[in-house]
């Protein structure tokens, strides 16, 4: 359980932010500023505390649904929507920090970027990163989103955009909605298949990365097939 102490000096978080700076405020104080007001029976700091007590760690905050937020007394539709918008904006800011890096320097660097984008998806997404000779990203493209009837992409779909972008190399990334990045037999088979197809066209398949919840698996780092 996410443990919180409600401090007496946290009663005026806006004033504390002005006096001390945002980095000196607790998580519940920062959230209270975003919520702005409480209700007659419950001060805003008590509401923010209850929200954070509903999660095991701050990393799970983004997983709260609108319905879960609205189940907390004092959080209506407007406040829940504002919270979700704030979380999405924070996610995009974090993503933009990664996007500033022109070159893909390591599988770990790319995996951390893609965990932010795909780690909480409920469906399987397969993304291709197309690069030039300097490993600079030409295009990032979602090739498909898995459905009940289809959960495997065809190499020709991936290579079509590689040729269109005149890419010299590519990296494949997909997520496991289960949260575990451990590869399946079909993941292994697909990786071998896409490598053969890339080799045939003179395109380098640098890696196939599987992302889960805060974890990743790199075929380049872990297996001997790329």
From Swiss-Prot:
GO biological process: proteolysis
Listed name of the protein: UPF0758 protein gbs1168
PANTHER family documented for this protein: DNA REPAIR PROTEIN RADC, UPF0758 PROTEIN YEES-RELATED
Entry-linked Gene3D superfamilies: Cytidine Deaminase, domain 2
GO molecular function, one term: metallopeptidase activity
Keywords: Hydrolase, Metal-binding, Metalloprotease, Protease, Zinc
Residues binding Zn(2+): 174, 176, 187
Family: Belongs to the UPF0758 family.
Motif (JAMM motif): 174-187
Domain MPN: 103-225
């Amino acid at each position: 359980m996410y443990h919180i102490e409600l401090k007496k000096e946290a009663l005026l978080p806006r004033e504390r932010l002005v006096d001390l700076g945002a980095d000196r405020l607790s998580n519940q104080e920062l959230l209270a500023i975003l919520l702005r007001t409480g209700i007659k029976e419950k001060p805003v700091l008590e509401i923010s505390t209850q929200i954070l007590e509903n999660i095991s760690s701050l990393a799970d905050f983004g997983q709260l649904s609108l319905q879960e937020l609205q189940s907390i007394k004092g959080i209506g539709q407007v406040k829940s929507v504002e919270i979700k918008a704030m979380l999405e904006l924070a996610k995009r800011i974090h993503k933009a920090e990664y996007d500033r890096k022109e070159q893909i320097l390591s599988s770990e660097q790319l995996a951390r970027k893609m965990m932010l984008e795909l780690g909480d998806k409920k469906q399987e997404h397969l993304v291709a990163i197309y690069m030039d000779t300097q490993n600079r990203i030409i295009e990032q493209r979602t090739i498909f989103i898995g459905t009940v009837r289809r959960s495997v992409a065809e190499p020709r779909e991936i290579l079509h955009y590689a040729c269109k972008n005149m890419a010299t190399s590519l990296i494949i990334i997909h997520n496991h909605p289960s949260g575990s990045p451990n590869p399946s037999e079909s993941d292994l088979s697909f990786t071998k298949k896409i490598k053969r197809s890339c080799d045939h066209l003179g395109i380098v398949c640098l890696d196939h990365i599987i992302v889960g919840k805060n974890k990743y698996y790199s075929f380049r780092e872990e297996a001997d097939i790329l």
